[in-house]
Structure formats: structure tokens, C-alpha cells
């Protein structure tokens, strides 16, 4: 049995990963701002606001200290929580909007990954961290200066972390995984923005109208299959590789 720790697990991709991991017989710690009505004997829900970094650090350390690692053949952290807003051109977002965005999309996953690595330094089982990224990490979009740059930063953290872990006797394996366009609440937020703020809005509206958005269940299954087969440390994976 393995243990999965998943952020942003109350909806969308995070919830799909959690439910499928439970179906496979694994235990899940689900982190989100709001708890869901999902009940399972192997599911533990934690109400954590990752934008509040100091509080999140304390709560996550408490969670990690409660884990008996000897019970698991592998432990995986999936940094899934994120936001696309502010959808605005550079120069138009407020300080508060930028702080919230980068704290959730970049600083929080870096912080949680560090805490995870320290806590399980002597653990000899399989240790994995997955950072959910986006094609926006490589491709600029007008109106997504914050989102593109935060995901690009997260990908470089993945690459650097993997490079550093080559020096470790019991390394943590970290990857980034780009799920592509999914039928989630984030896509609804994108479609509700304006042409002025987001130049590519019509493309994303068309993806929805033509049924081209992939389901979170499909993406979750693909990711879990990849993790079962094994991954290359520091690599950026894209869903397009598995279609």
C-alpha cells in the first residue's frame, strides 16, 4: 500500500486523483481549503489554506509528523492546488493579486516539497513529488503573465530539484506533469474572462463548445499509471505523450 498526499483535492483533477488512488487500495491525505462530503476509511481530509504560508507550514509539518512511513511501500506528494487568476495584462494586477497567485502556484509547492523531503530523508521506500504544471510554462499567453511565469518557475524548480537529488543516497523523485486542457472549474474561470484581459479567450471557449476538454478522470488515470511504471527524476511530462 502507498500513501498519497494531494493538494487541491476537493474538486477537479485533485479529487479525481484522490478517488482513483483510493480505488487502488492506497491511503490518501487530501488537502484543500474546504472539506468535501466524500467518506472513505482510507481518506483523511485536511482543511488548509496554502496561501497562508506560515499557517500552512505548521499544519503540513503536523500532518507529516503523524505519518508512520514504515506502513507504506511508497509515499507521493502531488502539488495540484493552483489558480489561473489574475487574468490581466502585466501592469494591471494588484500587489494582493500577485502575492496570492505566486504564493499558491509557486511558493507553496516549493515549501511543501522541502518539508516532504526533510521529513522522509531516511525513508527507503519510493518517494515521489508531482508538480502539476501547464503548457503555459513554455508558451506565453497575453493576459497570463502571472500564470505563465509561476508555472515556468515551478518547472525549473522540478528540474533543479531532480538534478540535486542525484547526490542523495535515498533520493526523492520529482516530476512536473502537464495535464493539458481539462473540463474543470479553472476552464470556466478562463472562459468568463474578457477579450481585453485574455487575448486567446475565443480559442478556449471553442474547446468547450466542441467537447475538446479532457475529463479529470482520464488525466488522473494517466498520471497514476505513469507513477506506477516509474519516472525520470526532474523531467517535465506532458499528457500529449500518452495520447
From Swiss-Prot:
One of its GO terms (molecular function) is benzil reductase [(S)-benzoin-forming] activity. One of its GO terms (cellular component) is cytoplasm. It is found in: Cytoplasm. Signal peptide: none annotated. NADP(+) binds at residues 6, 80, 147, 151, 184. The active site is at residue 147. It catalyses: (S)-benzoin + NADP(+) = benzil + NADPH + H(+). InterPro entries: Biopterin_syn/organic_redct, NAD(P)-bd_dom_sf, Sc_DH/Rdtase_CS, SDR_fam. Keywords: Cytoplasm, NADP, Oxidoreductase. SUPFAM superfamilies: NAD(P)-binding Rossmann-fold domains. It comes from the Bacteria. It holds the Pfam family adh_short. GO terms for biological process: tetrahydrobiopterin biosynthetic process. Its EC number is 1.1.1.320. PANTHER family: SEPIAPTERIN REDUCTASE. Reduces benzil stereospecifically to (S)-benzoin. Belongs to the short-chain dehydrogenases/reductases (SDR) family. This is Benzil reductase ((S)-benzoin forming). It comes from Bacillus subtilis (strain 168).
